[in-house]
UniProtKB/Swiss-Prot annotation:
Protein source organism: Campylobacter fetus subsp. fetus (strain 82-40)
PANTHER family (alphabetical): UPF0234 PROTEIN YAJQ
UniProt-recorded Gene Ontology molecular function terms: nucleotide binding
Pfam families, A to Z: DUF520 (PF04461)
Keywords: Nucleotide-binding
This protein's name: Nucleotide-binding protein CFF8240_1664
Keyword check for Nucleotide-binding: yes
Reported function: Nucleotide-binding protein.
Lineage, top ranks: Bacteria, Pseudomonadati, Campylobacterota, Epsilonproteobacteria, Campylobacterales
Keyword Nucleotide-binding attributed: yes
Protein family (similarity comment): Belongs to the YajQ family.
GO cellular component: cytosol
């Protein structure tokens, strides 16, 4: 039996699931009657982790966004993982919308998590390691209490708890 148990808290999005969800969304858009004959484009930029939606009007962009979000939810990607960056005219009568995939635990949220854990006065140690928070304790029950505590924070991030040892 190990003396110390630990796990890591990070924010992550499975990019393959995002690709699969977007392919499914493209298929649905191509078969929907309200998009027949209209420009409706969905693109993923893996490098910048953005999704670009292009369509003929704001209402069609909203419909595209709803389709994409529903497909992401079916692929178990939470809606908090997506943030709308901007909407702009894309030449002619088209409108362009950029969505950002939030998949990093920034230092502000990492500090908030560690502060809440330390304020709770549990018998655990929390430390920030780059884009993740490592939590260690002698008791697995304490670690499970920390997981529940962090989930109850309702941060606008797709949190994942990995490497429970």
């Amino acid at each position: 039996m190990a003396d110390e148990h630990s796990f890591d808290i990070s924010a992550s999005v499975d990019i393959m699931e995002v690709k699969n969800a977007l392919e499914t969304a493209k298929k649905e858009v191509s078969s929907r009657f309200d998009f027949k004959g209209l420009k409706a484009q969905i693109e993923l930029n893996e490098k910048e982790k953005t999704i670009t939606l292009i369509s003929s009007s704001d209402s069609k962009i909203d419909a595209l966004k709803d389709i994409v979000l529903s497909k992401l939810i079916k692929r178990e990607i939470p809606p908090v993982a997506i943030t709308e960056l901007k909407r702009e005219s894309a030449g002619g009568a088209n409108t362009k919308c950029s969505l950002k995939l939030n998949d990093t635990l920034d230092s502000l949220n990492a500090k908030k998590i560690t502060k809440v854990i330390k304020d709770e006065k549990l018998k655990v140690n929390a430390s920030i390691r780059g884009e993740e928070v490592r939590v260690t304790s002698k008791s697995i029950d304490e670690l499970q209490n920390v997981i529940k505590l962090v989930k109850d924070l309702n941060l606008e991030l797709p949190l994942s708890f990995k490497n429970l040892k």
